[in-house]
Amino acid sequence: MKWSAFKKPVSLLMSAALSLTIVSGVFTVHSSQALAASSTEETRFLQMYQQLKNPANGYFSPEGIPYHSIETLMSEAPDYGHMTTSEAYSYWLWLEVLYGHYTGDWSKLEAAWDNMEKYIIPVNEGDGKEEQPTMSYYNPNSPATYAAEYSQPDQYPSQLSGQYAAGRDPLDAELKATYGNNQTYLMHWLLDVDNWYGFGNLLNPSHTATYVNTFQRGEQESVWEAIPHPSQDNKTFGKAGEGFMTLFTKESNAPAEQWRYTNATDADARAIQAMYWAKELGYNNSVYLNKAKKMGDYLRYGMYDKYFQKIGSASNGTPTAGTGKDASHYLMAWYTAWGGGLGQTGNWAWRIGSSHAHQGYQNVVAAYALSNPSGGLVPNSPTAGQDWTTSLKRQLEFYTWLQSAEGAIAGGATNSWDGSYKAYPAGKSTFYGLAYDDAPVYHDPPSNNWFGMQAWPVERIAELYYILASNGDTSSENFQMAKQVVQKWIDWSMDYVFANQRPVTDSEGYYLDSLGNRVLGGNNPAIATVSAPGEFWVPSNLEWSGQPATWNGFSSHNGNPNLRVVTKNPGQDAGVLGSYIKALTFFAAGTKAETGSYTALGSQAEQLAKALLDAAWGYNDGIGITTVEPREDYYRYFTKEIYFPNGWTGLFGQGNTLPGSSAVPSDPAKGGNGVYASYTDVRPAIKNDPQWQYLENKYNTSWDPQTKKWTNGAPEFTYHRFWSQVDMATAYAEYDRLINSDQGGPVEPVAPKAPSKPNAVAGDAVVNLSWNSVSGATSYTVKRATTSGGPYTMLGTTAQAAYTDSNVVNGTTYYYVVSASNSVGESPDSPEASAKPASTPIPVQGNLKLEYRTNDTNPGDNQFRPQFRIVNTGDTAVSLSNVKIRYYYTIDGDKPQQFHCDYAAIGSSNVSGTFVKLPSAKPGADYYLEISFGAGAGSLAPGANSGEIQVRVNKTDWSNYNESDDYSYDATKTNFASWEKATLHLNGDLVWGLEP
């Protein structure tokens, strides 16, 4: 790239005034932190955090869900601004991670995860509502029935033909063994947050937010051609007796009532990426880190071919069913999906992967976190760590294979040509048996033309480069690939990105050089610019030609001289800008971590990042950083292009009949026989939007249907997209964390913030303390008192976020606080924690043993769900009707309770439970649950076990428990293990365990 100096933006004065306005009282959320911030970038991060969390700004719904956008009239991936996506949730986690880093308050991160689990991960999160009610009927030996994909929506519905038998799912058994069931712990990708479509949440009607879907009909189905439909379809809406299912698939009989969810793999991977950084920045709550591990365990379904066909076997048009992991491409595919039946005959379920892998969906940081012990999030299933180890290398190879001669990353690859396992075209380049595809998944517009699909994934590669360099791994092949890809990409992209200058283009968006010639690729182009103080410009689109060479390994890679890109259409997308700045920042920091100082390119990247951050701040309107967007595509609100098959008519959630009375005949050249409706025919409620009249007037006065041009300018909108704002906010934070903090920055160092409340665990003559580490702290001082509130006496100092106090007397309650220190000074004390050490009694051990586990890692919900297994270690049979289990807990508000046995190998009807209140409360217990067994449970032979017993308890008013201090609860026990804090009684005598 060619380097030119950056000018200081003239908007600094304006942005300083904006900063003063924000800090001086418009917002009330932790304004003291903004005032105390130690750098410009930290200040701006905290101000943007306040803007995002201020209820008056409208980023969140009444249920606390982040909207895709504050504004509602929009159509892109979501077709309405008050939808939300799994993408938005993953960005929310990232925001809260960096807020926790600055403030030491990690409760916001945990609240975000709880909200995600409640509203967009379709599991029973503790409210008793089963959102995957029939997943237990899934048969991993026959995951799903084949239906071909087609290029045009007009060619749908697709016949459920079973032409190709699905392969075997190799993950289901180990996931069941690890977690006790196969309820998929992944986000569904799309929510109708305000129930704007009107379908309602069938399986959890107390929620306003509703699981919905749109895209179902092939690569040419844009948002303008999609039909919104409920993910839980009992045929109330859609065609009578058929629901919406017959728009997408057809079979010999009417479709059954069903639920179905689709996961966007990039979003869940980003959530895991965020939790990795939380852990690196001092967060240590194993409950939520274990949830991230579990998500990563299930995310492996994104590595599998849609119908579990052997990878590469369809290159000749005849796929072979996979027998296990031979159906895994080890990349992040576009999606994975699962579903099942509803109602009394709904005893079936299915699961699919995806055959198409897009470079923009890969996440090497998540793969690192889930595979490397240093990453700290290796899932619990036996083969998960190895799968993610393979995936990490495979993803890095994928990027190397797809990098163009200039440096941009091409589209991706597929295991199913045209979505129907057709033979690969002659001469098609391959990658581990997958065929090169320049635009995987969708073609309207081509999926790899948007520059955001460059900035998103390469920012993650820049992170990995920094992580590996910081850990001293500068020689491995993984490091070499990460460095090569990000370095070449940064060098290419910086030629087309500008701060305080505006690039010169022609009428079609091509960059021009100083002679007025189009820049059509090549290395180190000299783009003509004009001075534009305070502006920023990044590319919007790319044009692709050629293909990579067939992959034969990193050592033989030739750099792809025949894969070329043309960079076009400079724009001002704030979200893309945020990701791009983070890519520059992590790359710059990585060069310093690798070599000890910034390389020449690293220094240029750091300076460009700073200039872009300063320029972007001038676009902050008090609600967020945003620019005016001309929407050339919004004529499509009025065109009729949503296909309905001939004779299909049904009810939409907004009360209208589909396809409506004004539909027009479809184009037979596209393969269908039906009609086309418009956006407003399908979603008439959009006409009530406050911006609709403006759009309609603009269309009537400016759109020329003959030339298909806006003769009086395209409609213009200003959007505050949640993900875009978070991308910008976190760009300020990461620059501050990696650049300012690393080199001292432009500000004076400050004393650290107070640690979070310590976790105090009492033992026999010992108390073990731990707390979240604090940014900038070099040591911690532990203080103790025997009276709550002090006065406290210093016990000692430690460089670690943990301390063991062995100078204690059993039976005495001790109160602890911790402060953090560095060369500048000492923080205030943490909140107080207490512990009472006690001698360890010896548990009873007879001829029965109790094993325990839980998959309930949320200790604050409204149910608890222990799972047990009784083992006969003696030499005589034991009748289970003579055995009782006692599980000790605190009720946290005395209310009537209900017992449920969800599953038992000995028969759920043979298991019953009663609740016994202790005469006097014990540590961690004021009640116990006593589980007993009927005669039908039979007896346990010597050496045998009872099989799994899954129980569930709730209060009748569904108020919450707090299990975190319950005597018998242990969130870390996710696999069956001996557990002495739940007891066994035989004929009334204690034969196993330790009572509180």
Residue ranges of predicted features:
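Recognizes extended acidic, P/S/T-rich segments that occur
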Residues: 781-811, 829
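Extended ligand-binding clefts on enzyme/binding-domain cores
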Residues: 47, 118-252, 262-266, 289-705, ...
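A surface/secretory-pathway sequence property marking extracellular, secreted
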Residues: 891-929
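Beta-strand-rich modules
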Residues: 805-824
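Short, solvent-exposed loop/turn segments enriched in Ser/Thr/Gly
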Residues: 858-867
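Asparagine-centered strand-capping/turn motif at beta-strand->loop junctions
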Residues: 870-875
